[in-house]
Amino acid sequence: MQIKTKAIVISSLKFQEKSLIVKCFTLSNGLKSYFVRDAFSSRKASQKIAYFQPLSILEIEAVHKNKGTLENFKEIKTAVPFQTIHTDIFKSTIVMFLSEMLHYSIQEEEKNEPLFVFLETALTWLDHHDDISNFHLILLLEITKYLGFYPDVSEIDLPYFEMKEGIFTLFHTSTALSEHETNLLKKLLDLKFDNSQKVFHVVERQILLRVLIDFYSAHLDGFKKPKSLDILKEIFS
């Protein structure tokens, strides 16, 4: 089946000497993996590699066999031409980390249009703004809405957050956050991209990042801690 759709690049992996395997989150079909033959074989072919930087947003034409095998691109072009995301060291570190988080979080080949639209909007915002120190925290929390485990805030006045149940509780359990961690999470729940400046200091951001990764681990089978986590911590320390 031939399709035309937008796609967000999640990862690209060199295969043998000249080819690439590219994983994309597509608007039309969810997660798909594509084989790019001879991506490194010539100057013209190697220009394609620029399309596959982390979280690039593409317009693709592809042949989908939908048999669980690698699919093939027919045509690729940039859908959203980013100006700063892949050149600014802070932003490029964020997208490298977030692409790893999405790699381990989006696990099914099924359409999730609301998540795609949210990610496209968020990445466009990141490209056009400079006050981004809390961007990754807000994004990771918001993504849980679309993956089905956003915190239940109906009892948000209670002092502890229970990670496995995703609820606020009166009593501290073995899988609950401390009261201090819970208060930081409550502050994060109130934030949007446009009102997040200077809310947390460095240590608080690192606590929240650990909390969010643990939260993902508690709710997603097979989730792994991103290898780029230490780089992100270093950049924002």
Curated annotation (Swiss-Prot):
Annotated Gene Ontology cellular component terms: bacterial nucleoid
Record keywords, A-Z: DNA damage, DNA recombination, DNA repair
Keyword check for Nucleus: no
Stored Pfam families: RecO_C, RecO_N
InterPro entries: ARFGAP/RecO (IPR037278), DNA_rep/recomb_RecO_N (IPR022572), NA-bd_OB-fold (IPR012340), RecO (IPR003717)
A GO biological-process term: DNA recombination
Domain of life: Bacteria
Family: Belongs to the RecO family.
Functional note: Involved in DNA repair and RecF pathway recombination.
Protein name, UniProt field: DNA repair protein RecO
Organism: Flavobacterium johnsoniae (strain ATCC 17061 / DSM 2064 / JCM 8514 / BCRC 14874 / CCUG 350202 / NBRC 14942 / NCIMB 11054 / UW101)
